[in-house]
Amino acid sequence: MNKKLLSLLVSGSFIAAVSTSVFAADTGVVNFNGKIVADTCEINVNYSNSTTGIVTFADTYPADYSGDGTVGTSKDFKIELIKCDPLVTKLNLTFSGTTTDTGFLRLENSETATGSATNVGITVTNKNGGTNNVKFDGSVPDVSTDVDNAGDSTPTIFNYTANVIQVGNNAPTAGKYASSATFEVFYR
């Protein structure tokens, strides 16, 4: 009987030694996978059915401006995001452009032809997030917009007001002005 017990103990010890050495290793493998999806939302800027839109202001006079930062005229515009991926729940828009100030709040007049307006710039106010002026430095704003349209044609709308403002102490001079900003969508 002792021989049977001894042989069982030796067999069990051998199996335990073999099975623990199976789990001892110095390396392993981790596999990663995912999916890259194409354009997450369709973009429509100011009824243009395009990613590029134009905001045209009403004519103003130099007398419409009374000092640095005063608004001569304003125009509302919107950026719509349609048919967003159902996984997207929040969106942010960031803006970049050439500005006249260190705070990145005033787009400069890029019209340089002879006779173009001077002392004028553009600001943009975010109507979705209160009365905050848009920064044109590419930074992501703190305010996100919830997506209303996961997978359907109901647009998620970002509403803005563009303002023509006096830049500096001298009143704007008569002439054409122009400016542009680039925006980027951040999906959350």
Describe the function of each predicted region.
Residues 1-11:
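Bacterial Sec-dependent N-terminal signal peptides
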Residues 2-4, 20-188:
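Mature extracellular/passenger domains of Gram-negative fimbrial/pilin and adhesin proteins
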Residues 9-13, 109-111:
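Generic low-complexity, intrinsically disordered sequence content enriched
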